[in-house]
């Protein structure tokens, strides 16, 4: 078979040729999978992932209304996304106007699908129901019942879905919703309760809630999503549940109230006067200023360290710019910083940050500053490379400066966060330098000379953190200088000045009672001194000005800019992730074994235990030749095609099915170490997967996902340019992929770089797919790979959780990191950014051959994370707009840096900063973009966070608090108190309560009991293996660590009292015993 993906290319591909190549290869793969499906050996006879070339096709496939794609395309040429959404809703309502309920339902779902680009599952599952109810006066009203998956749509889309409901209501002539006072009070109580148990991004005031509910022309309703019920306002006629309605709370609070300003723009332009009440809602201000915030410190987790308290000296210094692996919410750090920070920060790790958003994934950039550290020998040095960091790691006693964090302008634009003052850096300083002067190699003397001669600011390498010290410290430093002396091209200053010099960021070596400063001249000049004939002389008398910085400007007679006016607080969020997706427990086949497979769900055990026959609820087929009924689409007795007869609880002859599978595959089941199924099928029809697929997965050691595919999960990180050497491919392979052979290439938007771990897994999956094609379908193999490297050029499907639309990607290489490098457009097409999000890939042929929507769970959220539609090509106009805010300049202009000094709104500079959106508008392409900082190697940095390598929680906590003590910008006592109050105490209190209301579990068949059976035996399988589900160990697991921290750290008195009370209660409840409770087996009436 000739396959396109192996065709050698010699020419460099342009964007159009690249897109055609992707489309052709997808079609080739689709055709082969269709050929296999048509053999009738699957649960459907066609490939179940429809291909979509654009958003309009995705929406048509997702919602299932034929003919709307063309209308969406036409409207999109002349309207904004939101306007298209509202207009299409009107049109769809008119199509179904004879049935008002159906018209409302279809119109609202289509409108929401347009707002979410046809990628999210929210239009299908986020709206549980659309209904027509009755007001007290007998008139009709429209109610929209929201479910949990609406969260994924985002606040604006949530709010606009209510607006769409109102527009359609008017179109159909239905009157408005009129709530009663009691219903309004129910909303207030319910929202406050939801915030307590789940936490809302924005909790409106009772008056704001009342205003929205009273004035909204549409009833914002929801399913009872939480276990907790409201205590008052129960059993109401028009509210179907007493449970808290999560979907309603999200739409009202994070949608209508929080996004009130945005919604008003649309209501005003459409003259919807009934929505003018939103103008009196303050909501949550969209204008974020540059102010100190400790929000990122909330909910600290034990073992995940804090790297800097909010805006604290010594914390990360904000540096504006974009590396080739940052932007789209990802931030870059010097690899040395990753290592020095206890190796907790790895490439792909998530850090929670103070600004501009909530979090960022970390990527490497070795052309920005690393940390400055104090060593055991008294030296104070800056470390700018990871090799030096490894060499000095054990000698570090204090991390006095965390180094720089590189954050792109585009992230401030996306978050609408006013630009904090930039650090004074070399790229800013260079723009003051007169034309023709070389500013690359500037020593300490030349730096001062240039400032004096051209009246430009002092070079940032010799500009210190004057804003971090007090007048008293400045004056102490001056007195120390008076007692210093020049010696061998260095300046010796008394050791007593070390604390001030550390705060200033001055590097030195210790020599006895003196500190040796090699770069001394700019410091002396800054303090009002100069050197004449190897002697230091004061040239300007000391005089205090309004600030220390202004004082050194006066004393030096040159301009000295604030070196690091903005520090960024941060802590570790989620560690990086790269691992194959396994259901819990691991499953090879979506085939039911009920309880006969015991806790391991073993299909082979179920066969032995039942002599091959047992009852299960499953979808059955009847053979068209011999009439035999089984869960297989082909007859396991005679091999003929079977026709579906429906779901029933009936006998499965597993032994017959397995024998037929052995014959068909040419495999003996004795060869399998393990072969696992599922206890029950969760789909609506209870359709079982052909068991042969599971056998082949078991042979290749891979697991199946709920939809029949094999996935690999990874943290998302961006890349816009790559070096072929760093991704493990040759020049020849680079050329074959359609790239020009050069050092750095701009990556195509659908090309992806996967971790080595993913390559190994996908290689195994490719072997499974080839076996499946040859042994099961009787077709030629598709992949025929000899090594993992042969994956290069093959296609994958990228799919994010909470979405229902996959995106085609092409593997072009491999990385050593545990994260997923891809173009910002690729991540955005999946509705993801790079703030710590993760998603998955699967081989394209795996998706086409093995995915079936009939396997998906029927529960709410069952359609999430399933490729219900596939985007073959990426269109920048149809992806999440965050990717269009990525900036593309080679250097930020002077006007930008000066704008940061007045904390300008980022939107003022959008045209200047050439975002992707502006580039497309001005040049009609997003290609030929650039970046401001290079990264020598995208694999250079910590590859695995020490959070994952430290063996025990005690080790993690010890390292977390040890690091807190070493970092100057961290308050270790505060970290200790927060760990106890946000993690340890809630955990112990919660497990203590649950211990006394727990279930009991049979370890053989997993049956659970609210009360222990009087016999002490499992009533289902007869086993005496009953055990607790929550053990004493779960209650006391953090107690010793908590008491230890209480002694070692200065924590608040009230917290100490809480700890002592809980410790006393636990010790009284669980006195020391000879045997731990986990070893005790419950038998007979021992429990009582």
Swiss-Prot record:
Which cysteine-cysteine pairs are annotated as disulfide bonds in the entry? Answer: none
Molecular function terms, GO-annotated: DNA binding; DNA-directed DNA polymerase activity; single-stranded DNA 3'-5' DNA exonuclease activity
Q: Which UniProt keywords apply?
A: DNA replication, DNA-binding, DNA-directed DNA polymerase, Exonuclease, Hydrolase, Multifunctional enzyme, Nuclease, Nucleotidyltransferase, Transferase
Query: Can the keyword Amino-acid biosynthesis be found in this entry's annotation?
Result: no
What is the role of the protein in this entry? Possesses two activities: a DNA synthesis (polymerase) and an exonucleolytic activity that degrades single-stranded DNA in the 3'- to 5'-direction. Has a template-primer preference which is characteristic of a replicative DNA polymerase.
**Assembly state and interactors?**
Heterodimer of a large subunit and a small subunit.
Catalysed conversion reaction: DNA(n) + a 2'-deoxyribonucleoside 5'-triphosphate = DNA(n+1) + diphosphate; Exonucleolytic cleavage in the 3'- to 5'-direction to yield nucleoside 5'-phosphates
Q: Which family does it belong to?
A: Belongs to the archaeal DNA polymerase II family.
InterPro entries, per database record: PolC_DP2 (IPR004475), PolC_DP2_cat_dom (IPR056172), PolC_DP2_central_dom (IPR056171), PolC_DP2_N (IPR016033)
The record, for Pfam families, names: PolC_DP2_cat, PolC_DP2_central, PolC_DP2_N
| NCBIfam families assigned | polC, PRK04023.1
User: EC number(s) per UniProt?
Assistant: 2.7.7.7, 3.1.11.1
Entry's Gene Ontology BP terms: DNA catabolic process; DNA-templated DNA replication
The protein in question is named DNA polymerase II large subunit
């Amino acid at each position: 078979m000739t396959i396109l993906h192996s065709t050698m290319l010699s020419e460099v591909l342009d964007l159009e040729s690249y897109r055609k190549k992707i489309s052709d290869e997808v079609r080739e793969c689709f055709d082969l999978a269709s050929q296999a499906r048509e053999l009738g050996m699957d649960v459907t006879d066609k490939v179940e992932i429809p291909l979509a070339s654009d958003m309009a096709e995705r929406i048509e496939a997702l919602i299932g209304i034929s003919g709307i794609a063309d209308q969406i395309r036409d409207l999109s040429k002349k309207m904004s996304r939101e306007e298209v959404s509202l207009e299409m809703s009107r049109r769809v309502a008119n199509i179904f106007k004879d049935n008002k309920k159906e018209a409302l339902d279809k119109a609202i779902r289509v409108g929401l699908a347009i707002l979410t680009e046809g990628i999210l599952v929210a239009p299908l599952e986020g709206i549980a129901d659309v209904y027509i109810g009755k007001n007290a006066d007998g008139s009709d009203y429209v109610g929209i019942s929201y479910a949990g998956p609406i969260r994924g749509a985002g606040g604006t889309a949530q709010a606009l879905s209510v607006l769409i409901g109102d527009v359609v209501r008017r179109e159909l002539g239905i009157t408005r919703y009129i709530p009663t006072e009691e219903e309004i009070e129910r909303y207030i109580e319910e929202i406050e309760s939801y915030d307590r148990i789940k936490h809302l991004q924005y909790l409106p005031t009772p008056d704001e809630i009342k205003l929205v509910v009273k004035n909204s022309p549409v009833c914002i309703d929801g399913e009872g999503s939480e276990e907790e019920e409201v205590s008052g306002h129960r059993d109401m006629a028009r509210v179907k549940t007493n449970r808290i309605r999560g979907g309603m709370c999200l739409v009202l609070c994070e949608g209508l109230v929080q996004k009130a300003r945005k919604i008003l723009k649309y209501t005003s332009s459409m003259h919807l006067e009934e929505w003018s009440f939103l103008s009196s809602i303050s909501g949550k201000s969209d204008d974020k200023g540059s102010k100190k915030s400790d929000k990122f410190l909330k909910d600290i987790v034990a073992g995940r360290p804090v790297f800097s308290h909010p805006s604290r000296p010594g914390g990360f210094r904000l540096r504006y710019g974009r590396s080739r692996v940052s932007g789209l919410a990802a931030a870059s750090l010097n690899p040395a910083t990753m290592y020095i920070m206890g190796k907790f920060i790895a490439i792909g790790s998530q850090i929670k940050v103070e600004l501009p958003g909530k979090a960022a994934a970390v990527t490497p950039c070795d052309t920005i500053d690393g940390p400055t550290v104090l060593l055991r020998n008294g030296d104070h040095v800056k470390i700018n490379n990871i090799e030096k960091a490894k060499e000095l790691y054990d000698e570090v006693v204090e991390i006095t400066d965390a180094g720089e964090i590189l954050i792109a302008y585009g992230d401030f634009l996306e978050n609408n966060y006013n630009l904090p003052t930039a650090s004074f850096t070399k790229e800013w300083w260079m723009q003051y330098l007169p034309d023709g002067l070389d500013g690359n190699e500037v020593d300490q003397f030349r730096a001062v000379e240039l400032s004096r001669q051209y009246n430009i600011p002092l070079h940032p390498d010799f500009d210190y953190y004057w804003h971090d010290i007090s007048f008293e410290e400045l004056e102490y430093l001056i007195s120390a200088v008076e007692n210093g002396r020049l010696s061998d091209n260095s300046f010796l200053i008394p050791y007593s000045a070390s604390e001030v010099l550390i705060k200033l960021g001055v590097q030195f070596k210790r020599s006895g009672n003196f500190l040796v400063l090699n770069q001394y001249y700019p410091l002396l000049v800054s303090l009002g001194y100069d050197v004449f004939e190897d002697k230091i002389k004061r040239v300007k008398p000391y005089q205090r000005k309004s600030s220390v910085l202004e004082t050194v400007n006066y004393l030096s007679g040159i301009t000295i800019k604030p070196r690091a006016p903005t520090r960024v607080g941060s802590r570790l969020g989620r560690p990086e992730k790269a691992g194959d997706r396994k259901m819990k427990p691991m499953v090879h086949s979506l085939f039911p074994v009920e309880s006969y497979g015991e806790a391991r769900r073993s299909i082979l055990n179920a066969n032995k235990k039942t002599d091959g026959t047992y009852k299960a609820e499953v979808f059955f087929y009847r053979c068209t030749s011999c009439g035999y009924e089984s869960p297989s689409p082909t007859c396991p007795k005679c091999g003929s095609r079977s026709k579906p007869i429906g779901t029933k609880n009936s006998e499965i002859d597993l032994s017959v099915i397995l024998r037929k599978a052995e014959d068909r595959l040419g495999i003996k089941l004795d060869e399998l170490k393990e072969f696992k199924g599922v206890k029950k099928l969760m789909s609506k029809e209870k359709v079982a997967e052909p068991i042969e697929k599971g056998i082949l997965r078991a042979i290749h050691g891979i697991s199946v996902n709920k939809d029949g595919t094999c996935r690999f999960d990874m943290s998302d990180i961006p890349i816009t340019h790559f070096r072929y050497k760093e991704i493990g491919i040759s020049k020849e392979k680079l050329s074959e992929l359609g790239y020009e052979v050069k050092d750095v290439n701009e990556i195509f938007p659908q090309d992806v770089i996967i971790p080595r771990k993913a390559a190994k897994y996908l290689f195994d999956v490719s072997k499974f797919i080839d076996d499946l094609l040859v042994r099961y379908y009787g077709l030629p193999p598709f992949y025929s790979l000899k090594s993992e490297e042969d994956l290069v050029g093959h296609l994958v499907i990228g799919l994010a959780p909470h979405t229902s639309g996959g995106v085609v990607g092409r593997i072009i290489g491999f990385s050593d990191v545990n994260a997923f490098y891809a173009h910002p457009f690729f991540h955005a097409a999946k509705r993801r950014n790079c703030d710590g999000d993760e998603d998955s890939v699967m081989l394209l042929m795996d998706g086409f051959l093995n995915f079936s929507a009939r396997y998906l769970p029927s529960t709410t959220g069952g359609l999430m994370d399933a490729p219900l539609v596939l985007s073959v090509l990426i269109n920048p106009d149809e992806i999440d707009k965050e990717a269009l805010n990525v900036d593309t300049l080679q250097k930020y202009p002077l006007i930008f840096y000066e704008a940061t000094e007045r904390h300008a709104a980022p939107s003022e500079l959008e045209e200047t900063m050439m975002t992707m959106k502006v580039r497309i508008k001005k040049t009609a392409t997003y290609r030929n973009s650039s970046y401001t900082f290079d990264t020598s190697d995208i694999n250079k940095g910590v590859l695995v966070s020490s959070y994952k390598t430290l063996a025990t929680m005690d080790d993690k906590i010890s390292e977390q608090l040890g690091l807190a003590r070493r970092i100057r910008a961290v308050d270790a006592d505060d970290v200790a108190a927060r760990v106890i109050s946000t993690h340890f105490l809630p955990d112990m209190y919660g497990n203590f309560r649950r211990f006394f209301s727990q279930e009991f579990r049979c370890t053989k068949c997993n049956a659970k009991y609210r009360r222990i059976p009087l016999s002490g035996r499992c009533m289902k399988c007869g086993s005496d293996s009953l055990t607790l589900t929550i053990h004493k160990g779960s209650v006391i697991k953090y107690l010793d660590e908590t008491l230890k921290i209480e002694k070692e750290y200065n924590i608040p008195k009230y917290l100490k009292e809480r700890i002592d009370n809980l410790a006393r209660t636990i010790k009284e409840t669980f006195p020391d015993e000879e045997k731990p409770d986990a070893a005790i087996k419950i038998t007979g009436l021992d429990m009582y």
